[in-house]
Each structure stands twice: as C-alpha cells, then as structure tokens.
A protein has these predicted regions:
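Metal-dependent amide/peptide-bond hydrolase catalytic core
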Residues: 1-4, 28, 54, 183, ...
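Fold-level recognition of mixed alpha/beta catalytic cores in primary-metabolism enzymes, strongest
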Residues: 105-108, 113-114, 118-224, 233
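Acidic/His- and Gly-rich active-site-bordering loop/insert found
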Residues: 2-111, 132-137
Length: 327
C-alpha cells in the first residue's frame, strides 16, 4: 500500500492553493449564485485528471457537476461533496479584495476561501493525486460540486435524486472544521406564521381585530410549547427562535395582517411532522379561546437532523487519517 506522502505530493498542495484562488476569483455570491462559471472551471480541471465529468444545469446561469473516478465496482462509492456558492461579503470593508484570492501571510484571502472553496479545492487536488498515482479503487470516487447550498440546496437536491449516482458508502463534506471530524448535524425547520385580523381606525381599535396582537398571543404560546426531544451528546438540545416579524401599515391603522418566521433547530430523533402538528394544534387552541383568531403556518425549509455512529468504519478510518496527518 502506498503511503499518503507518496500519493499527495507538493505539486498537489500547490494545485489546491491555485484551485482555491481561482474559485475565489469567480463570483458566486448567493443570491443569485450564478455558479455556472465556477462549475465549468472545476469541470475543466477534473477532466484533465481523467475524471468523467457530467454537468448538471439548473438555469442559464447556474449549474452543479458530478466528477467520477471509476473503481472496480467491488464496493460502493465514496462521495466528496462541496458547494460552489458563497454568502455576500457584507458591508464592512475588507483588508483584502474579497474576490482577489490573494495569498498573503500563509492564507488565501477572499469570500468563500474557507466556506467552502478551500475544501472544494482540496478535494479536487486529492482526486488529481489519486488519478496520477493510478491506484486501483474498489469503488468509484465521486466529487459533487453543488449550487445553492447557502439558500435552498438546489444542487444537492438535484444530484442526490439522480439515478446514475449509484450506491454511496460515505459522504465527506470539507466545510471548515479546523480538522475536526463532525458526525452529526442539527436539522432545520423554518416556519412562517401568518395571522389575519380586521382593520379599523386607530382611534377605534375595538372595531377591528389586531393581527399583531394575535401574533403576540401565538409567540407567547410558542414559548410554552414543549417539543419532545432527548439532549444529543454532540449537538445539545432543540432550539426555537422567532427571528422576523412584520405587520401593520400606519401608526393609526389597526393591522389586519402580520407574519413571523420561526427558526427551529432539531436533534436526531425528532420528527418534523410531529413538530408541525404541535404548532397547528396550538393555533387551534388559540382559536378556541378567541373565535376571531385566524392563523396559518407554512414550511419554508425542512432539513432533517443527521448523524453517523462514532463506531462506523468510515468515521474510524477518517479519525485515523486525521491523527496521522494533522500536527
């Protein structure tokens, strides 16, 4: 068996740096994403390594890709996954051009260099190193570079549903983790609640039904709801937070409409459908106490919590590798 240092050579480390710099220079701030040029650049580099590359178009300006080094088929594939988009650079001034990809002080500076074009570049270089070493693979090595992770997971949803993806034994996602292995992730359940009332002049509020006050009642009820869960040893507990509130048109007009968004973070073992039912039951109870109470709830985002057992062979192997290579 070849040692890691015989496979991943200094030129591959240099390639990873170059790939990261070039990807940072391609603007993929999401929204709107516009990941197509980054996907095309990634595809061109992986094709040079001998990978079979398939572009996965979403819109005229957005795409993901699948690259594959073929194995013998004796084992399921190992899937590398990384996203092409990045969050906006914000309003604060940068010390370096956020789209410059400048190498300074031992770091690559730019939007997405950590989250997660650096991880994507490392996977590209690793794939190149394995291809050049001509190591027989028991299963395929697949790299999925996806669009839209920062918003709606457009690319990941599309790629995971493709029939040609094939069986996968493990997924590696090199989000910035300071070389720690993360084996669990909280789920996300975003809800939008809307209350509807009856407008009236502010001088005669008794003639209307105040939708904002209805929302206040619901938020108070939400704080008292107990959502069944077990504390997770790695992730902690379930959380809920009302993070936006919008309603009313003028100070002297009783509002007839109000919306709020709720960010819930779930832990393994929780059922999102059961949580939604509990919220809907809370609405029913409020309506029973106040016949004029009108509310509806809508799911904005639904991602279930995930975890891999610590004793899983892939986790154990990754832990061994990290121990060997991290100073």
């Amino acid at each position: 068996m070849m040692e890691l240092k015989e496979i991943f050579r200094p030129r591959h480390e240099e390639a990873a740096v170059k790939y990261c710099q070039e990807l940072v220079r391609i603007k993929t701030v999401n929204p709107p994403g516009d990941e197509l040029p980054a996907a095309e650049y990634t595809a061109s580099q992986l094709e040079r390594s001998g990978a079979d590359v398939e572009m996965v178009p979403h819109t005229a300006a957005r795409a993901s890709l699948l690259a594959r080094l073929r194995g013998s088929g004796r084992a399921p594939a190992l899937l590398y996954n990384g996203h092409l988009d990045s969050v906006p650079p914000g309003d604060e001034p940068w010390s370096h051009d956020p789209l410059g990809g400048e190498l300074a002080d031992g770091r690559i500076w730019g939007r997405g260099s950590a989250d997660m074009k650096g991880g994507l570049a490392a996977m590209m270089a690793a794939m190149q190193a394995l291809a050049e070493a001509n190591i027989p693979l028991a299963g395929d090595l697949i790299l999925a570079a996806t669009a839209g992770e920062e918003t709606d997971s457009l690319g990941a949803i599309s790629i995971s549903s493709r029939p040609n993806l094939g069986p996968v034994q493990a997924v590696v996602i090199p989000e910035p983790s300071s070389n720690e292995i993360f084996i669990a992730e909280k789920g996300v359940l975003w809800l939008e609640l809307a209350t509807r009332g009856k407008t009236a002049h502010g001088s005669m509020p008794e003639l209307g039904h105040n939708a904002i006050m209805m929302m206040v009642d619901f938020i108070s009820a939400l704080r008292e709801m107990e959502f069944s869960h077990k504390e997770h040893p790695l992730l902690g507990g379930f959380s809920r937070s009302v993070n936006t509130l919008s309603g009313g048109v003028k100070t002297n007009v009783v509002p007839d409409f109000c919306t709020a968004t709720i960010d819930m973070r779930t832990v393994p073992g929780q059922d999102h459908a059961a949580i939604l039912r509990q919220v809907e039951e809370g609405i029913t109870r409020l309506k029973g106490r106040r016949p004029e109470f009108q509310a509806s709830v809508r799911v904005l985002k639904d991602r279930v919590p995930v975890e891999t057992p610590p004793e899983d062979p892939a986790v154990q192997r990754f832990a061994q590798i990290v121990t060997e290579i991290v100073p």
